[in-house]
């Protein structure tokens, strides 16, 4: 009887330790995302400039990790390496109710890079889902310059649709 009692106590102890380890592991994996670096975009950009910004031949990007390095860093948490931008189709927080603070509130629709510019078109969760375009000038391998940040009335499926939206005033 005594051996059985000891076995039960040992099993219970191991189960408790396992439960604690699982909780600690899950909490470490679901650490809330920190804020990103504050990016200052120009206050006003003319319609002609907005149209001109997307005139280049852009290589389309559908994976966040393929963004040019300085732009990728702009979409990472400050002081960390986790992305604040989810890949297309990946889990993200689409509303103002945050169920998992470790999941980004922004999700890439698509991006594009040319020799001297990069744009990122993404959806952002909140009180209402919004569709954003951010355009950056690429100065070297490690620096970028924010050129324009706009809100679009709807998401674009491809670069031509995005260009049409901008030309027609659908991104302001």
Report residues per predicted region.
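N-terminal secretory signal peptides that target proteins for export/translocation
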Residues: 1-3
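Flexible low-complexity loop/turn motifs enriched in small/helix-breaking residues
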Residues: 5-10, 21-117, 149-172
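Bacterial N-terminal signal peptides
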Residues: 12-17
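Short beta-strand elements that form the blades of beta-propeller/WD-repeat-like
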Residues: 117-123
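Solvent-exposed loop/turn segments at secondary-structure junctions
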Residues: 124-127, 152-154
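Structural motif
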Residues: 128-134
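Residue-level detector of beta-propeller blades
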Residues: 132, 145-148
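Short loop/turn segments immediately following beta-strands, especially the blade-tip
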Residues: 138-143
């Amino acid at each position: 009887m005594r051996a059985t009692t000891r076995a039960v106590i040992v099993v219970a102890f191991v189960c408790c330790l396992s439960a604690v380890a699982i909780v600690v592991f899950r909490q470490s994996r679901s650490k809330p995302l920190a804020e990103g670096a504050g990016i200052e975009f120009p206050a006003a950009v003319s319609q002609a400039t907005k149209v001109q910004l997307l005139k280049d031949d852009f290589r389309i990007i559908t994976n966040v990790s393929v963004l040019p390095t300085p732009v990728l860093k702009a979409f990472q948490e400050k002081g960390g390496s986790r992305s604040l931008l989810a890949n297309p189709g990946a889990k993200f927080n689409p509303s103002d109710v945050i169920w998992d603070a470790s999941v980004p509130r922004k999700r890439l629709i698509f991006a594009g890079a040319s020799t001297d510019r990069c744009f990122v078109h993404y959806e952002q969760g909140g009180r209402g889902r919004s569709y954003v375009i951010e355009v950056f000038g690429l100065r070297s391998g490690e620096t970028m310059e924010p050129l324009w940040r706009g809100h679009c009335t709807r998401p674009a499926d491809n670069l031509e649709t995005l260009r049409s939206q901008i030309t027609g005033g659908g991104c302001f």
